[in-house]
């Protein structure tokens, strides 16, 4: 996986100081960012030129204390063929020697008005999401009440139709059929559509529909955190389904576990409403309100009261 410098330039809203169109095609292969402090002093052991080189106030102030010759020599050594881009934070002035070294070594120079630490965070967050390894999952990803719900189930059970009904009820489609999921960190999953399927839903008997064209921009979303999975399966009278909500079921994707709810599909059952309820119930649990525990406590108290009466 890699990200082109031109994509970083657009997404993080940076200013291009030096770099041709060809140089903007350079690829960034790591989300790690280098703050070249010791390198300014001439110590290049363990230098990582393949990383983005971010220069903030500390690095810049030290650089400006050098003589013009030393400044030029240090920058020439810092700018390597594998260096994708050098970024200057805080709208700091670009010294002539840096422009000269960039021209000699053909290195892209970008600048931002943002503070160094905040800029570093923005770049890392963007690159982490773009460079993370993707896992393709069959299903429908919806944004329901601000929560990412992954709808799965056997082929033909009605996942896309349920997604369409949820869109009509005011929720947003993220992806249909193929959901590309990646771990943004050790605890968080994010999902997005395959580019060719963006905003599209396949409905049997109707064909492919463009949700954005039919229902507007408010009906779609480019990406979403995946917080809960819903698995649709055919109703089986011989199978026991969870009725209290205390059965623990999880789905693991890319090393991250999320809760999963299994919903039996039966003629006449409004699945979209059930999924809405599952999403709201998940949010309530996250806020510390668990209806199952409340019911169990009430039941325990009732049993205790009955035992006292019989005694």
Swiss-Prot record:
Its cofactor is Mg(2+). Residues 201-210 are annotated as: Important for the catalytic mechanism of both phosphorylation and dephosphorylation. It holds the Pfam family Hpr_kinase_N. InterPro entries: HPr(Ser)_kin/Pase, Hpr_kin/Pase_C, Hpr_kin/Pase_Hpr_N, P-loop_NTPase, Ser_kin/Pase_Hpr-like_N_sf. Keywords: ATP-binding, Carbohydrate metabolism, Kinase, Magnesium, Metal-binding, Multifunctional enzyme, Nucleotide-binding, Serine/threonine-protein kinase, Transferase. It catalyses: [HPr protein]-L-serine + ATP = [HPr protein]-O-phospho-L-serine + ADP + H(+); [HPr protein]-O-phospho-L-serine + phosphate + H(+) = [HPr protein]-L-serine + diphosphate. It comes from the Bacteria. The keyword Kinase applies. Mg(2+) binds at residues 160, 202. GO terms for biological process: regulation of carbohydrate metabolic process. Belongs to the HPrK/P family. NCBIfam families: hpr-ser. This is HPr kinase/phosphorylase. The lineage of its organism: Bacteria, Bacillati, Bacillota, Bacilli, Lactobacillales.
């Amino acid at each position: 996986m890699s990200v082109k410098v031109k994509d970083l330039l657009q997404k993080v809203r940076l200013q291009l100081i030096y770099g041709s169109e060809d140089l903007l095609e350079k690829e960034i292969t790591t989300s790690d960012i280098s703050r070249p402090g010791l390198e300014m002093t001439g110590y290049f052991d363990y230098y990582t030129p393949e990383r983005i080189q971010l220069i903030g106030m500390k690095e810049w102030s030290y650089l400006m204390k050098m003589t013009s010759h030393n400044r030029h020599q240090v920058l020439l050594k810092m700018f390597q063929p594998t260096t994708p881009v050098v970024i200057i934070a805080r709208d700091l002035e670009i010294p002539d020697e840096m422009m000269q070294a960039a021209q000699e070594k053909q290195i892209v120079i970008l600048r931002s008005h943002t503070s160094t630490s905040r800029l570093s965070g923005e770049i890392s967050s963007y690159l982490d999401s773009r460079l993370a390894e993707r896992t393709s999952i069959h299903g429908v990803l919806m944004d329901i009440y601000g929560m990412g719900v992954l709808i799965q189930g056997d082929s033909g059970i009605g996942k896309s139709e349920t997604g369409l009904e949820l869109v009509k009820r005011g929720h947003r489609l993220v992806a249909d059929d193929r959901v590309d999921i990646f771990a943004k960190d050790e605890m968080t999953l994010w999902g997005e559509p395959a580019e060719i399927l963006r905003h599209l839903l396949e409905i049997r008997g109707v064909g492919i529909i463009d949700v954005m064209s039919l229902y507007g921009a408010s009906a779609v979303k480019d990406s979403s955190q995946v917080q809960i999975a819903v698995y649709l399966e055919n109703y089986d009278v011989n199978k026991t389904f969870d009725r209290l909500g205390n059965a623990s079921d999880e789905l693991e994707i890319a090393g991250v576990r999320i809760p999963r709810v299994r919903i039996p599909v039966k003629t006449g059952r409004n699945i979209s409403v059930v999924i809405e309820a599952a999403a709201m119930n998940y949010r309530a649990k996250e806020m510390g309100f668990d209806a199952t525990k409340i019911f169990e406590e009430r039941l325990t108290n009732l049993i205790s009261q009955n035992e006292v009466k019989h005694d």
